[in-house]
Amino acid sequence: MAKEMDKLVTLTRKEVLDLLAEGKSLADTDVRKANLMKIDFTGADLRNCNLSYANLKDAVFKDADLSGASLWNANLEGADFTGANLEDADLDYAKLRGANLFRANIRRASLPTELIPREDIMASVETGCKVGQKR
């Protein structure tokens, strides 16, 4: 029961920064609604992490593992997902304008195609252009 209670605790920005500095995994953690703007998550383990409603503007996720993560309604404007694993991630209603998805794995990811055309997202994955800014 104690382990279940731990999962209900939402981490703060400081706690996330401390875990990253220690090189610890953020897999299965809850950081919804947190202000994580401009944080460098390069290579981080964020599998099944709940990042719903989080402010991740200009954050860096290069080569990070976000498989199964929930980014539902998150602010991802200007974020860099170069080489990130977003397989099975939920990006519904996420704000992706200006994000870079170059070579990101978006297999079976739920994409915010009601907000941004799928072609714009795919162009970013294939060419490295920013989402919403055609090359």
What are these regions, as identified by a protein language model?
Residues 3-135:
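Tandem repeat scaffolds
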